[in-house]
C-alpha cells in the first residue's frame, strides 16, 4: 500500500488560530477551531500516517543558540493560557486519531525535517502542513509543503517565484542574506537582492568565496564575514539526524474517533 505521511507543524497552526480569537484566554475556542481545521486537512490530504509535532515550551533555544548566541533571543514566550491548554488541545487531536510528538530540547523544525526526510528518501509521499518557508529547503519529488491558511503549495515553482532560486540553495541564501526575525545576521551589507545575484552565479557560499569571478563589491565582505555566513547557513538549515524513538507503524492513521 502506498504511504502518505502528513506531518502537522502543530504550534505553527495553533498560534495562528489562537491569535485570531477575540478572547485570547478562550482555549475551548482554539480547540474547536483547530479540530475543525484538522478535519479539513484529513479530508484534503487523505493520509495513511499522520503526526503533529510540537516544540518544547522551555526558553532553551537549543543547538542553534550555541552557534549564534543571539538566535531568537527576543522571541515572545507562549501565552500562559495557551500553554496551560496545550494538553487539552493534544487530547482533542488524539481523539481524531493524531498522535503528538513532543520535542525534548530539539526544535520542532528538526523533528519534522528528520521524519519527513526519512520517509521521502524511501520514495513515499510526505506532506508538511506549515506556513514556514524554512521547510522549502527539504522539497523533493515526494516531499511537499502545504500552507493551509493561504491555500497554496510551497513547492519548487513557489521557491522560484519567491526567491529566484532552487530549494537546495535556500540555506545558502539565508546564510548570506540572514533572517531578521530569527536574528540570523548573514553577511552585513548583503541583502536578498545581493544574495540572489551571488547564488545565481555560484551554487554555494563556498563556490562564491573560492572563485576569482566573485564581483569585487562582494570580495571584501566575504573576506571579513565568510565564517559568519557559514555559521548562519548552518543555523538556517535543518537537521535530519534526530533520534525519533518510534517507527512509521506507530503513527498509522485510522479513520474514526478514539475514546
Curated annotation (Swiss-Prot):
Source species, domain of life: Bacteria
GO MF term (any one): DNA binding
The protein's enzyme class: hydrolase
Gene Ontology BP term (one): DNA replication, Okazaki fragment processing
Chain segments annotated as coiled-coil in the UniProt record: none
Binding site for Mg(2+): 109
Record InterPro entries: 5-3_exonucl_a-hlix_arch_N, 5-3_exonuclease, 5-3_exonuclease_C_sf, DNA_polI_H3TH, FEN, HhH2, PIN-like_dom_sf, Xni
Gene3D superfamilies, per the entry: 5' to 3' exonuclease, C-terminal subdomain, 5'-nuclease
Alphabetic keyword roster: DNA-binding, Endonuclease, Hydrolase, Magnesium, Metal-binding, Nuclease, Potassium
Cofactor(s) listed in the protein's UniProt record: Mg(2+); K(+)
EC numbers: 3.1.-.-
CC cofactor note: Binds 2 Mg(2+) per subunit. Only one magnesium ion has a direct interaction with the protein, the other interactions are indirect.
CDD domains to which the protein is assigned, alphabetical: H3TH_53EXO, PIN_53EXO
Domain 5'-3' exonuclease, chain residue ranges per copy: 165-255
Binding site for K(+): 176-177, 187, 190
Region (Interaction with DNA): 189-194
PANTHER family, alphabetized: 5'-3' EXONUCLEASE FAMILY PROTEIN, FLAP ENDONUCLEASE XNI
Family, similarity comment: Belongs to the Xni family.
Cited function: Has flap endonuclease activity. During DNA replication, flap endonucleases cleave the 5'-overhanging flap structure that is generated by displacement synthesis when DNA polymerase encounters the 5'-end of a downstream Okazaki fragment.
Name this protein carries in UniProt: Flap endonuclease Xni
